[in-house]
Amino acid sequence: MAASFLPSILVPLVGLVFPAIAIASLFIYIEQDEII
């Protein structure tokens, strides 16, 4: 039963968390590049 509703949670989680991590890491890279 857990496997039936797992994709409905996992897909939005990956769709929101992965871009957030990518944007945050890019922002940190740009900030460090400006400081140096």
UniProtKB/Swiss-Prot annotation:
Domain of life: Eukaryota
Disulfide pairings: none
Xref: SUPFAM superfamilies: Subunit VIII of photosystem I reaction centre, PsaI
Localisation: Plastid, Chloroplast thylakoid membrane
Function: May help in the organization of the PsaL subunit.
Protein known as: Photosystem I reaction center subunit VIII
NCBIfam families membership: PRK11877.1, PS_I_psaI
Native organism: Chaetosphaeridium globosum
Listed PANTHER family: PHOTOSYSTEM I REACTION CENTER SUBUNIT VIII, PTHR35775
Membrane topology: Single-pass membrane protein
